[in-house]
Amino acid sequence: MDAITINSLFLVGAVLVAASILLSSFSSRLGIPILVIFLAIGMLAGTDGLGGIAFDNYPAAYLVSNLALAVILLDGGMRTRASSFRVALWPALSLATFGVIITAGLTGLVAAWLFNLDIIQGLLIGAIIGSTDAAAVFSLLGGKGLNERVSATLEIESGSNDPMAVFLTVTLIAMIAAGETSLSWMFLVHLIQQFGLGIIIGLLGGGLLLLLINRMELANGLYPLLAVSGGILVFALATALNGSGILAVYLCGLLLGNRPIRNRAGILQTFDGLAWLSQIGMFLVLGLLLNPSDLLPIAIPALLLSLWMILFARPLSVFIGLLPFRSFNLRERVFISWVGLRGAVPVILAVFPMMAGLPNANLFFNVAFFVVLVSLLLQGTTLSFAARKAKLVVPPTLAPVSRIGLDIDMNNQWEQFIYQLSCDKWCIGATLRDLKMPQGTRIAALFRGKDLLHPTGSTRLKEGDILCVIGQEHDLPALGKLFSQSPNIQLDERFFGDFILDADAKLQDISQIYGLNLEPTVDKQQTLGQFVLYLFGGEPVIGDQIEWDGLTWTIAEMESDRVSRVGVKIVTDKA
């Protein structure tokens, strides 16, 4: 490769990445998932597009995609709160194992019939497209404001279901290559190996990386590089030992993100940029790899297969997988069924048969790509609408304009939150002493126009003021409500109820006020929060609703595992 070729690659790569970034702003305006934008730019630059770039290097695409996935999952793991496992771990694992098997099996049987393949080849197609994609789920769920049970289940499922899909794909490829037509006991051994080694290497590697980061004295800019290189090492080691690198790197990130770690803010900020670059690079490469003209001959059967998987196989697998978990209501189950987003992972798995030289490998690849396109366009574009229809969007609290980590104490993560007060904020005109600031937070600075003011208790807030607040991550919900817009209060009332009650109130007092018909066996001395927990069962989350005794009871606030506020609304009969 000469210097001119190398420079041309730099030029083309820079133009494609810049175009992806600039055109990403159209995603929200057009209601198209941003990943589709990246994919479309890659396809336009490819052989059948305006760019005419001939790219069919499957090993290179496999390399780029796996590297990108490792970075995306490391970042996703760091941003997943361990507290979400309280409500979602076991349901997500059920979907990540039994759910994938059911989806792959049902989809594979129909694929064999539609494309006139034998059963094993059909099941291989089912295995390739059987898992949801972490990159797509993390990207499309971000900022949707879903209740914690649903969002955590979908995120943990997408981060942990790839081992099952990889295991099924690799096993079926080996069977086809060896001419086998039935399953053997090695099927179970490979499954245990994928999950077991992925978990062990991910947790051990994450623990060692955490220890190394906290022990080393480095320049601040080197900590993120150490973290990402360590995560890729964990991914590569698990994969080399025939474990799940995807699960390992996700668990590594989860451990780093939920333990005290040096320069946490700097690591997260760097990871944010790396994750975006990884998504852009991965979908550009996959778009270049695809020739849209190859999809036309299979369009009708591939569309039928996509609809079968989306409308039947995925919902059935979700309803079966969530049968033991009564905390999920019907609306949540239906929504989880709909968010079976496919993305880069099925396309990467479809490269496996190409590299193994299997017959019909091109067909497997094109079908997988077609299913991914249908999933992103159909499910991805309707995600917000489906969430609203299912009434799973919890009224958001105001997020700061920006947040900056203060690397003062590794065990006590202080941050600076920046809030800008527009005219619709209810606190405009209030004095600082009137604000009920969360305990332990401080207003460090107040900017008015170009001037830095010295805030005192008598300082009145005005439109356009910029507040710099020192606090910690757990203070964000209270600060968000403090600086929220007035319309959000009305939204809270519509969603949570006509009245919001303190959960520490005695049930006996509440029953007298609202005329509740309590059964004799109910302890009237318990608190409202304890009684609501009894009504819901399982692990409640903010936004959970239940109708009882002519009233709708909604969990409005929680502190750790404890219900702190409950919304009450009178049930009205709809004509």
From Swiss-Prot:
GO terms (molecular function) for this protein are: flavin adenine dinucleotide binding; potassium:proton antiporter activity
The UniProt entry lists membrane topology as: Multi-pass membrane protein
**Any single Gene Ontology cellular-component annotation:** plasma membrane
Gene3D superfamilies per the record?
1.20.1530.20, 3.30.465.10, Regulator of K+ conductance, C-terminal domain
What's the chief localization of this chain? membrane
Q: Which residues form the RCK C-terminal domain?
A: 403-485
Q: Name one GO biological process term.
A: cell volume homeostasis
Membrane-crossing ranges are 3-23, 30-50, 58-78, 95-115, 122-142, 172-192, 194-214, 221-241, 244-261, 270-290, 293-313, 334-354, 363-383
Subcellular localization? Cell inner membrane
Q: Which reaction does it catalyse?
A: K(+)(in) + H(+)(out) = K(+)(out) + H(+)(in)
Q: Does the record bear NADP in its keywords?
A: no
**Alphabetical list of InterPro entries matching this protein:** Cation/H_exchanger_TM, FAD-bd_PCMH-like_sf, FAD-bd_PCMH_sub2, Na+/solute_symporter_sf, NhaP2, RCK_C, RCK_C_sf, Transptr-assoc_dom
Signal sequence interval, chain numbering: none
**Could you name the domain of life of the organism this protein comes from?**
Bacteria
Keyword annotations of the record: Antiport, Cell inner membrane, Cell membrane, Ion transport, Membrane, Potassium, Potassium transport, Transmembrane, Transmembrane helix, Transport
Q: Which SUPFAM superfamilies match?
A: FAD-binding/transporter-associated domain-like, TrkA C-terminal domain-like
Similarity section? Belongs to the monovalent cation:proton antiporter 1 (CPA1) transporter (TC 2.A.36) family. NhaP2 subfamily.
**What is known about what this protein does?**
K(+)/H(+) antiporter that extrudes potassium in exchange for external protons and maintains the internal concentration of potassium under toxic levels.
Its recorded name reads: K(+)/H(+) antiporter NhaP2
